[in-house]
Amino acid sequence: WPWQQVMDVVSLLALAGGLLLAATVPDGPHLPRAARLQWRALGALWTHRPVRASAFGYFGHMWELYTFWVLVPAIVGTRLAGAPASAAAFAVIALGTLGCVAGGLLVRRVGSARVANAQLATSGLCCLLAPWMLHAPDLAFALWLAVWGTTVVGDSPQFSTLTAQNAPREAVGSLLTLVNSIGFAVSIVSIQLFAMLAARFDLATLLPWLAVGPVLGLWMMRG
């Protein structure tokens, strides 16, 4: 199908799901009154070291994640074309599910910070290996993309968990909202920048710069 039709169908399904939820799932009797967004909660990013660490770790992760997903079809396209390329790109992105599940299970043993750091470091290493892996044998190329696709997203819930755990109790909701919003703003900048640069540079030159996010994120998480 053309991508426009896919987007139309997915949008209609999302709309139908929202309407179904609104029509069939009422608010419970103990629903608290909605709190107002507290902009001053942003101050915790500078005054509260654990919040600053997890938030900036998340920002670094968001620099890489969505831009990688945007570039996956181009990366796969260096080896495959047509339907096989589409299927392979889907598989690489879908492997992130395993990273999230595995990370959630490991948290019980080693904690969210270690899981987040390990996955961010692994995906960052995959960025830096790009100039060599793009020309590697097919099996090595496939394993590289599989590892990258698995680890690039698995740290996301861990950073959110750490921010929620470390945030002041009275501002958890506001801080999560603001941190997520900033994170997606970082993604927009990253996507636009790399899309522009992709017209001038090849993937071997471009992909290592995705590691800027993981490197900065790990540096902020060091404390």
Identify the meaning behind each predicted range:
Residues 1-11, 82-84, 193-214:
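A membrane-interface helix-boundary motif in multi-pass transporters
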Residues 12-31, 218-223:
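C-terminal membrane-cytosol helix-exit motif in multi-pass small-molecule transporters
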Residues 50-101:
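Extracytoplasmic gate region of multi-pass secondary transporters
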Residues 111-162:
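C-terminal transmembrane helical hairpin of 12-TM major facilitator-type secondary transporters
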Residues 164-201:
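A late C-terminal transmembrane helix in Major Facilitator Superfamily
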